């Protein structure tokens, strides 16, 4: 089988499936990407380069679409070069961030499988969750933002969504094309472990399960992942719990949602709140094995999200049997049950978040039980080694 993967990043969501397919000598795995940093065995990585950037005078409704088009054109040119060199895929599997837009024009008779991550809606998702009514201007921008996704929904032979909540966001006219199939969690790696140390070298601090540690992990410290509310909660908890250590993994940036003008959410909260920074440790982005060790020593791992894409990190934490305190939002409740696999709080209720974290810290035995229950959920339905064969069989079923 010849399979062509498309993603701006490499290997991103396709890491496990691309590597698994590449193990078979009968398969040729080609991956078109914008990433130049990583290579994987038996995968032919073909890097594309962008010819231009978004023009400054671009209509603001079109900036996201323009960015997608710039990537789409670069991927298309790269695919044409591969075609001229004699490569023809049996199937194309791509992320719908622009890369897949023109594939049917280059390989019209090749099945196109699209990975759909998020379709923007005026209701039922992230928009309006904060109680602010979207203006007509906002809605017009939102409608335009889906343009490239609508092209892919029309063009693709089939689509994959990793969760039911994400699939529900897609238009009903295209639901017949969509299969809900999660990426899978490496449950052999993300396991609970007792004798673990998490070392913060620049502070000469070693943390273990014997310590009282509240953890928070995110790609970006942003509103969509509840970072401001988390910091508010920590400012209250610090005054009540002198031995509590807080470890925050992630970068001082916004990946999703609105950015602040002239500052960041981290800077804003550090300026606004009375915090004991000697007990708050910003450790940046962690390599995966160190991140898993952080989960293993956590006394209470806090995860919050708008009704939006659920972070992989939540399921990693569940697989590690981590004591979890999370927001009671639909991306979370698809996987977690309050008082069974963790403790859930209202996203905007800081006092409730404080209460739930404090309860977790005071009731370790109960939280250990919830953590074990959470791991069982992952073992039952989201194991990578169970889902990977399903993904491969689904891909093969689409080849004519």
Identify the function of each model-found stretch.
Residues 1-46:
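N-terminal subdomain of nucleotide-sugar transferases
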Residues 165, 184:
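Carbohydrate-associated surface elements
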Residues 201-225, 231-238, 246-247:
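Conserved donor-binding/catalytic core segment of Leloir-type glycosyltransferases
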Residues 157, 296-309, 322:
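Acidic donor-binding loop of glycosyltransferase active sites
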Residues 52-62, 110-148, 188, 192-197, ...:
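Acceptor-binding helix/loop patch of EC 2.4 sugar-transfer enzymes
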Residues 338-339, 343-350, 359-364:
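Conserved acidic donor-binding segment of nucleotide-sugar-dependent glycosyltransferases
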Residues 250-254, 260-286:
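Nucleotide-activated donor-binding/catalytic signature segment of Leloir-type glycosyltransferases, i.e.
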Residues 352, 359, 366-381, 387-393:
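A short, well-ordered alpha-helix in the C-terminal region of glycosyltransferases
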